[in-house]
């Protein structure tokens, strides 16, 4: 429900282990919220975190928005949070997300076979990692 979603976002924004950012299309007349990107599950000892994103409407897919968003949070993770490494998991079928991470210099690190359910079928989760250079 919308109430639970608002509560989730408020709690997330209070956390020092998760940072949620909105992705917007900005025109002269309005801002359109099209998705979110998160730096989450931050481990300050190991200086690592997971990056996850969602662009909801398909008309905004394949326009480079995810690639730009991943690049922005990469800079935040390195320069503001002092993280050493980011990682992200993509469903095997989500080729566009995989390409967006690869364009940002993430490297394929592993596959968890039959890890998740997508469209009522088991599928693989492919993991990508990026060491943030000094």
Segments (PLM) and residue ranges:
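A short helix-loop-beta-strand connector motif used in the catalytic cores of GNAT acetyltransferases and
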Residues: 9-24
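Acyl-donor (CoA/ACP) binding surface of acyl/acetyltransferases
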Residues: 20, 27-134
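Conserved GNAT-fold acetyl-CoA-binding loop/helix
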Residues: 1-10
């Amino acid at each position: 429900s919308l109430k639970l979603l608002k509560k989730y976002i408020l709690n997330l924004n209070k956390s020092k282990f998760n940072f949620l950012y909105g992705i917007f299309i900005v025109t002269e007349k309005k801002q359109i919220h099209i998705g979110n990107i998160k730096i989450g599950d931050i481990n300050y000892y190991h200086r690592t975190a997971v990056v996850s994103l969602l662009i909801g409407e398909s008309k905004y897919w394949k326009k480079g928005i995810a690639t730009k968003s991943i690049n922005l949070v990469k800079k935040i993770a390195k320069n503001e949070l002092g993280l050493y490494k980011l990682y992200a998991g993509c469903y095997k079928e989500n080729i566009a997300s995989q390409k967006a991470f690869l364009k940002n210099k993430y490297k394929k690190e592993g596959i968890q076979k039959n890890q998740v359910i997508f469209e009522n079928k088991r599928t693989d989760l492919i993991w990508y990692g990026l060491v943030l250079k000094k």
